[in-house]
């Protein structure tokens, strides 16, 4: 039976006919044209509507619940009357994260309904635990379920970010400049410099990456190097890359340690994609709570309340993102209408993991191409010439319970290589990592590490060991070293103590040993700042040479308003030095940090070293670049000066802007049109960024969704009305540069007194400007907001006559008193009031 829309007349008849739905059947009173269904008399008009077919809402109802206040709409049903038999034509389910979910069996039964008839009680049984009940009086359909028919609303562990918000060609260029000068003791000097450039040009999700550097700029030894030239498309959970790649762009899943330096021209394809976001912050074992009605779920650990969350009726997974990491038990309390309905203990399993996280699907990449191997040398003993070779391989990673693993198999230069990496947490206190490599030329490598947090939480311990043996083909060196270290937090034993750290490194291949021991204690912390004590010793021995020992002790004083001061002594190279350091930080301005240090030998033989050394530095954050300037005079007499600066440029069409930030290779250009030093703020995913002047560029991380809101700056006296373009939602891929062009009006609150040309006051007059209106008081005084672009006030009188006040607001900010102003074009206010005219706005 085809479905038709109700005509207005039929809707009226239907509404009128609904009155009769509540009339109990009575043979003596029933209309001969009425029909009875399920004990309800159906008027002729409503019967006709049912024959045409109609949609009714579908609600889920928990069996045994009183009332319908906790019912949730989960879809709609199309019902129709066929030869006196009421049927369901089909069910349309509506998915919602907040709604209860039905079991898969119940869902399949619902979706399979096609022209299913209701019985005399207007019910359709689905399973032993679920049935459909139709109420003609309320004109709604209920899915009545027992708890066994409910599914569980689980939280998504992955999500695609979707299509790019930027549909035109755009580009981001990041730059990093470094200049170094070394002044020698004999008066000579040498200077070196570099400029690194990374450009990403994109069209929607497609982008091309160029990465290279210039060296020795301005010198006779200028050189350049191109490191990457790559096309990439990472979309909907799959990534393709091709061109001149580095090993990270070729594959990023498993270890790949046997590849030597060189250039790779190849392709890569797989599902290791940044366009799919995996949430590894949830518990690997879901924490589930059942609520018979809308209520709260409380999570408690050792008597401490960790979380309170609200849910509707049904089985729900509790959000564990905000819970501490580790493996532990929590008490789950379900509270409905202020009463504890249930209480039980569940296990939380949250562990730090590499890659996608526990429970993510298998990740894979296949890759290959041509490999140009650079010339290789090992301490002048082994040398291998540059060589061309093929390269092909595959990588994969995944997890099994708490075990995370990754594997890579590849071949080049007629050699086959296999590598694996395993990470296994043992409880919440021990973490084991193993990485192995095996090649067909008998090369092998094994790296293992164990880290542990000892009971009580006051100490930790770590152990690392690496052993590598290389055959006659791979371009790597042997290795044999081990390290052990730990940290002891004595503060947990006694509040007056601090933290003690120790480490030992042993490189058995080169017969070198390195010991360190450090102690830090907070001596004072209060209103006037904090005082800390640092002390330590280091001892280094390389081969048969004499051991080199260094010692230090220092007091660090941190003062309010970003001030820091340190004083101490160090002993190294056979003499003792006194050291002073100071630092000042600024929240605003171009210079953000300035610092200086001074050292003087106070005992021992300095030999050829100078007795006095020191340096100074400044960190800056300007509109188009940020970086550091450092000048240092070392004990050996050399004076070293270096400058580093970095920034970004964004481009889209006719829009181009620069920034001193390098947060990512995507971004947003804001064309605010603000004059002079006007300032507003952009709130992006909760973070506040200042916007100054007419145009700003803000680099952002790629593969992200952003909610952007423009607002007035709390650091500015100016007030702005952001008429349009206040809020935006963006999805950015590498190289995407979005352009936001809001309509911004700079507002000034103007107050003053308005007069006619003869000096008479315009009392109780309605005056207007570009954005609003107001009325003067009996003294001709007024207060109104004015758009600085249109600094005029006008007054209309005698029908179509107008006088106008031109305001001088170029230097005005926030609020201004303009004093007496003249409305040019009005000779006298008295003439207006004598005519008795009602002045108009």
From Swiss-Prot:
Protein family according to the UniProt entry: Belongs to the EcpC/MatD family.
The task this protein performs is described as:
Part of the ecpRABCDE operon, which encodes the E.coli common pilus (ECP). ECP is found in both commensal and pathogenic strains and plays a dual role in early-stage biofilm development and host cell recognition.
Additional remark text: Not expressed under classical laboratory conditions, but is functional when constitutively expressed.
Family annotation (InterPro entries): CarboxyPept-like_regulatory, Pilus_assem_C, Pilus_assem_E-set-like_dom
Q: Does the keyword Signal apply?
A: yes
What organism, scientifically named, is this protein from? Answer: Escherichia coli (strain K12)
Q: Which UniProt keywords apply?
A: Fimbrium biogenesis, Signal, Transport
Induction per the UniProt record: Negatively regulated by H-NS. Positively regulated by IHF and EcpR.
Name recorded for this polypeptide: Probable outer membrane usher protein EcpC
Q: Where is the signal peptide?
A: 1-29
Lineage of producing organism: Bacteria, Pseudomonadati, Pseudomonadota, Gammaproteobacteria, Enterobacterales
**SUPFAM superfamilies recorded for this chain?**
Carboxypeptidase regulatory domain-like
Which gene codes for it? ecpC
